[in-house]
A protein has these predicted regions:
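Short, small-residue-biased leader/transition segments that mark boundaries at the very start
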Residues: 3-4
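Phosphate-binding and adjacent anionic-ligand microenvironments
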Residues: 8-182
Length: 182
């Protein structure tokens, strides 16, 4: 609602690169801007502090209302959701109806060298081919794990089958190039 949109600073919500593609489509439809950070609520909060934003969160459910807390807080999130439900006289399912969650497949592949695997021209070409095939109906994200020798390949598309196929296509190239630890 407009009352709640006006509470956003610069009409912006902070998310991570792993937030569902459907969330971004819903934000676009509602005229809400978003800032994307690396995965981790510490990066979400850092972006919020650096830019003065009030609302941010991760797909994992860590929702941060910077006016009330510095970390995700389930009780605050529940209270804020109830506040909106009461003000709009709508159920949670009615509020969430415009949000179409896209099927998502995320696979990890253990590699010898995360950076080399991700920067390889053939791997990049495979990723670009998937991105081109998806167009505006999905997305691909390939990123290094911050804690282990793993490259994460994530695809969101119209069907689970599409996601599986595209993720497997990219992983096949990583394996063909000899980066995978078998």
């Amino acid at each position: 609602s407009d009352v709640y949109k006006r509470q956003l600073i610069d009409n912006t919500v902070v998310t991570t690169v792993m937030s569902n593609f459907g969330l971004y489509k819903a934000f676009d439809a509602a005229g809400i801007d978003y800032a994307k950070t690396k995965v981790g609520d510490k990066y979400v909060y850092e972006c919020m502090v650096n830019n003065g934003y009030r609302l941010g969160g991760e797909q994992s459910g860590h929702i941060i209302f910077s006016k009330y807390a510095t970390t995700g807080d389930g009780i605050i999130t529940a209270l804020k959701m109830m506040e909106v439900m009461i003000a709009k006289k709508m159920t949670l399912s009615q509020l969430a109806a415009p949000l179409q969650i896209y099927p998502q497949v995320l696979k990890n592949i253990r590699v010898y060298d995360k950076t080399a695997a991700q920067d390889d021209t053939d791997v990049k070409a495979a990723v670009d081919k998937v991105a081109e095939s998806l167009g505006n109906d999905g997305r691909i994200l390939v990123r290094e794990s911050g804690t282990e020798l793993v490259v994460r390949v994530m695809v969101e598309a119209g069907t689970h089958e599409e996601c599986e196929k595209y993720v497997d296509d990219v992983i096949a190239v990583i394996k063909e190039k000899g980066y995978a630890v078998e």
